[in-house]
Swiss-Prot record:
InterPro entries: C4_dicarb_anaerob_car-like, DASS-Related_Transporters
Transmembrane segments: 14-34, 117-137, 158-178, 188-208, 209-229, 240-260, 303-323, 324-344, 359-379, 399-419, 423-443, 458-478, 484-504
Entry keywords, A to Z: Cell membrane, Membrane, Transmembrane, Transmembrane helix
UniProt protein name: Uncharacterized protein HI_0594
GO cellular component, one term: plasma membrane
Record's keyword annotation contains Flavoprotein: no
Record localization: Cell membrane
Main location: membrane
PANTHER family per UniProt: ARGININE REPRESSOR, BASIC AMINO ACID ANTIPORTER YFCC-RELATED
Sequence similarity: To E.coli YfcC. To B.subtilis YcgA.
Membrane topology, record value: Multi-pass membrane protein
Keyword Transmembrane found: yes
A Pfam family recorded for this sequence: DcuC
């Protein structure tokens, strides 16, 4: 063997390749798993009636009354429909039926990629606007000036910033389910963490990991535990004490883990899981940052950064109070960007160049979102999601209490891969899974907790969720992330399992 030849090394596939492989697998599953469907109930506010959609038959309408819900074995308050708390179709228990097979073919691979991108256009526009905003601010030198001021003030107490960001993300997750919105924080916080001597994974840990742990142990999050409790026919305050306890334990684990990791890479930078890519990260996020030079932190730059920071609480307020979604969030960021353009002191040419360059850097992230949506479309159009739900509900039905609830936890781990939307999985699964708790004699709120903890254990890794979008944005290989996050998944499942078994045991006493 020629010693001069370089030894070949395995390069882990990119996010695009991983999702493309999963898309092909999803198409293949439509040939293996039988197609099936539950009848779905929706509320028509215009006519004040319930509409039941079943495969192969005409839609049926029923009076929007409590009696109708009782007759359909749906234990949800009528007000949750009439007041708009539940807007998505609800699966009706006991209505699953096999239907003709909906095979997907080769042409559906590319078709779903296009359709998924079209469905995700609102998110993509938000990301493009965010990227353009970052590009303009970068051109003004405001980020680098602010970074230098921050590094000087936090010298010796760098982890305090990691701690503060993590706590805020945990609180955002448990109260309002901050997930996609957190994408906006990466462009500003990655340079901060790199300047403090950390790596990009610390930034993902402080934002995505902390927010996801907070969402996993949701207390009042309307997009997961509240809608799941409503779909299960109970108050969301039932079981909130154990979820709050889990939140404290989970947040402690995340912060302690980040402290350990930060301390290790401070002492030995080569310990970083992304050490091989450190120069690429610094070139991308800190290409004009030199700690040995001085950039004046002028009043104009302070004003620009202030406007940038203000945009985030405005976004959070809009989501929580104003019912905003991505079009409104994009519009608010664009409005602030235009203000920054006028006070930036840049020429019209520089403004347009910096905006388009900033947006273009996030094209890959946007395409990942569209591809992930394409995978979900294949599963929906192949009509195999309901079949998997029906099969899993039959598996855990009739088990003893503790075994049943741990089985539910495992079921929701797998369902989290198929249906990465927390609200979507809640309205699909809770009307089916929650009544099973009655048959084994345990409260339904324990099933809601199992749903939340199981689903989010999967969403730390699920390629169809937000994780690949995050990793693509920061150019972090998926295998490095898996190595970093696995201990936290173990903590989540351990805490969740213990709390579930304790709740069942206390109820059985």
């Amino acid at each position: 063997m020629d010693a001069s030849k370089k030894k070949k090394t395995f390069n882990f596939p990119s996010a695009f390749t991983i999702l493309f492989a999963i898309l092909i697998l999803a198409v293949g599953l439509t040939w293996v798993i039988p197609s099936g469907s539950y009848s779905k109930l929706t509320y028509n506010s215009t006519d004040n009636v319930f509409v039941v959609k079943a495969y192969g038959v005409d839609d049926k309408t029923y009076p929007a009354t409590t009696d109708t819900l009782d007759n359909l074995n749906i234990k949800i308050k009528l007000s949750n429909f009439t007041e708009g708390v539940i807007k998505k179709p609800i699966a009706i228990p006991g209505t699953y039926q096999r239907v003709e097979q909906h095979h997907k073919g080769i042409e559906d691979i590319t078709k779903s990629m296009v359709e998924g991108t079209i469905e995700a256009v609102d998110v993509m526009v938000f990301i493009f606007v965010l990227g353009g905003m970052i590009g303009v601010i970068n051109r003004t030198g405001s980020f680098n000036a602010g970074l230098m001021a921050l590094v000087k003030k936090t010298k010796g107490n760098e982890f305090f910033i990691v701690f503060c960001v993590s706590v805020l993300m945990v609180l955002g997750g448990t109260t309002c389910g901050i997930e996609e919105e957190a994408v906006a924080f990466y462009p500003i916080l990655v340079p901060v963490f790199l300047a403090l001597g950390y790596d990009a994974i610390v930034c993902v840990g402080a934002i995505f990991l902390a927010a996801s742990m907070g969402t996993a142990f949701s207390t009042i999050n309307p997009f997961s535990v509240v809608i799941a409790s409503n779909a299960a026919g109970i108050q969301f305050t039932e079981g909130i004490g154990f979820r709050a306890l889990g939140l404290v334990l989970g947040a402690t684990c995340v912060i302690a883990y980040l402290y350990w990791y930060c301390k290790k890479i401070k002492a030995d930078p080569s310990f970083s899981y992304t050490y091989d890519d450190r120069e690429e990260f610094r070139q991308r996020y800190m290409k004009n940052f030199d700690p040995n030079t001085t950039i004046p932190f002028s009043a104009r730059r302070k004003l620009i950064l202030t406007l940038f920071c203000i945009s985030f609480p405005i976004m959070i307020w809009g989501v929580m109070v104003g019912g905003w979604w991505f079009p409104q969030m994009a519009a608010s960021f664009l409005a602030i960007t235009i203000i920054i353009m006028f006070i930036s002191g840049l020429s019209e040419k520089d403004i347009m160049e910096s905006f388009t360059e900033g947006a273009s850097e996030l094209v890959g992230v946007s395409l990942i979102i569209g591809l992930a949506r394409g995978v979900n479309l294949v599963l929906e159009q192949g009509m195999i999601s309901d079949t998997i739900l029906d099969y899993m509900s039959n598996v855990v039905s009739g088990m003893p209490g503790s075994v049943f609830i741990l089985g539910q936890l495992v079921v929701f781990i797998f369902l989290g891969l198929i249906v990465p939307s927390s609200s979507g999985l809640a309205v699909l699964s809770m009307p089916i899974m929650a009544p099973l708790a009655d048959s084994v004699g345990i409260p339904r709120d324990i099933v809601v907790s199992a749903y939340n903890w199981g689903q989010y254990a999967m969403l730390f890794l699920a390629p169809t969720g937000l994780v690949l979008v995050t990793l693509q944005m920061l150019q972090i290989p998926f295998d490095r992330w898996v190595k970093f996050v696995m201990p936290m998944i173990g903590c989540l499942l351990l805490i969740g399992s213990i709390l579930l078994v304790v709740q069942v045991s206390l109820y059985s006493v």
